[in-house]
Amino acid sequence: MNYNISKEKMMVGFLLTLFLLMNSCMQDNKGFSNLNIAQFDSLRIITSADNYLKLEPIPITNFSCDRSLGTVNDFYSEGDYWWPDSTNADAPYVRRDGMTNPENFKAHRKAMRDMSIQVAALTAAFKITHDIKYANHAVKHLKTWFVNSDTRMNPNMNYAQAIKGICAGRGVGLIDGIHLVEPARAVTVLENYNGISKTDSEEIKKWFAQFLEWVTTHEYGIDERDRENNHGTCWVMQVAEYARLTNNSELTNYCIERYKTVLLPNQLGEDGSFPMELKRTKPYGYSLFHIDIYAMVCEILSTPDDNLWAFELSDGRGIKKGIEFIYPFIKDKSTWPYVHDVMYWDQWPVRHPSLLFAGEAFNNAEYITLWKSLKAEPSADEGMRNFPIRQPILWVN
């Protein structure tokens, strides 16, 4: 056996253990706390963060696609379910719902997702250990993506989810931006724990304010907002988090009202399902994805005076009913009464944030116990694409 362990590593391990033991019994009034998450999730968080310390930031400027009409700083992606016309190679692409085209340009999406994963893990490790090395590396990623002029992403998604022969970009492309939500939350955590300078945080917030302006005024943003399925909910989640970060109370209030008057009435069925998602070729995965986004909307926007977790329409529809619908099928997937997903059926379920945060909101230990029993995250690229919240410790006080 190798006993050659540095004193520094021994001290870090000792301090982390001491921190977790001292706080393991500290509970909030709902029987749930970030300290319990730290205790449960610390090994995964710190192991990942230590690996990410070895990786340099990778901006979108490292990759280009000759099909993009944008500049090197413009995010570019292509529609997932669009394929070449088998009868005419020169014709516009045709749609095959649920079937992802593996030949599409994915480099910018992957770079954004990797940044999101790494910034979130590094910030989570910093919150647990208070070791500044994690914060410094997270900030390095954030500045690469949102501050440095030669590598930053332009604050728009004009060229997201393009379709060959049809459009250079479109409103539904904004859904690619869901992987910016956790980095936005990380900025606040870094601020709260003195892990980022005021200058750096203000520059990053400036980028998000500009992006928020684009999301809420550009025709693509408006188009995405008005989508009736999960796309419209993802718009609200993004706007809610970016508005919170940039102290835009007007947009925060707008999102609260939109959840109450547009999302719930038009999306949630009487039984708590999402009927539009059940009609898709991947109804299980989309139902899980959509309830997770609902949960994040409630988590971001709820206040002591306006708790969206408790909000219900006059007929009783609310997120509580949505969680109650999907919970049995997370607990026992074999009971799912609808068609199986055409792809990636085996990727789900995982530690869905809706389970964890609903467990907190409704003081339901069964939800939290089930969350703990599941694998941390999906493994396939498409699964990761629809799983933007990976570090719940960033979302609790």
Task: Locate the predicted segments by residue.
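Bacterial N-terminal signal peptides that target proteins for export
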Residues: N2-V12
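Bacterial N-terminal signal peptides
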Residues: G13-N23
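Extracellular glycan-targeting catalytic surfaces
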Residues: C25-E224, E257-K260, I300-D305, E312-N397
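Active-site-adjacent structural elements in folded domains
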Residues: F105, K198, T216-R227, T246, ...
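An alpha-helical repeat/solenoid feature that recognizes helix-turn-helix modules
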Residues: D176, G232-T233, S287
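Loop-centered beta-sheet repeat module
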Residues: W207-S249
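Long, repeat-rich segments with strong aromatic
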Residues: M237, E241-P337
